[in-house]
Curated annotation (Swiss-Prot):
This is Putative pre-16S rRNA nuclease. Belongs to the YqgF nuclease family. It is an enzyme of class 3 (hydrolase). Its EC number is 3.1.-.-. GO terms for cellular component: cytosol. The keyword rRNA-binding does not apply. One of its GO terms (biological process) is rRNA 5'-end processing.
Amino acid sequence: MTNRTIIAFDFGTKSIGAAIGQELTGSARALAAFKAQDGSPDWQKIEKLLKEWQPDLVVVGLPLNMDGTEQLVTEQARKFANRLHGRFGVQIALHDERLSTVEARANLFDRGGFRALDKGSVDSASAVVILESWFERQLG
């Protein structure tokens, strides 16, 4: 296994969570979430993040319904991933993110109760769950 640096995004129309991880350890940590306007992030802040961390791969969570069907935000997440690739030339992987927010909320609540459940924290914690789930899938 290589030691690639990987960034994950939990796409949302109002907030986009971010996490960074190392493939060798299979672990991730939350980064600051980005505010978005109708799904459009501040691309300068995204560019700054990518320049700072220089990821080998970017994983974008793909929001699906529980039965695996797509929803409106699924297509928006795909567009976000395509724009990341087009603007910055980064390699992209899409990853099923079903139940990532539920797991992230539970993890945050366990650590800090209701006070820990602000929107940005939940979105970035969801990005951690997405990335760690992606790592697990690569091993399995």
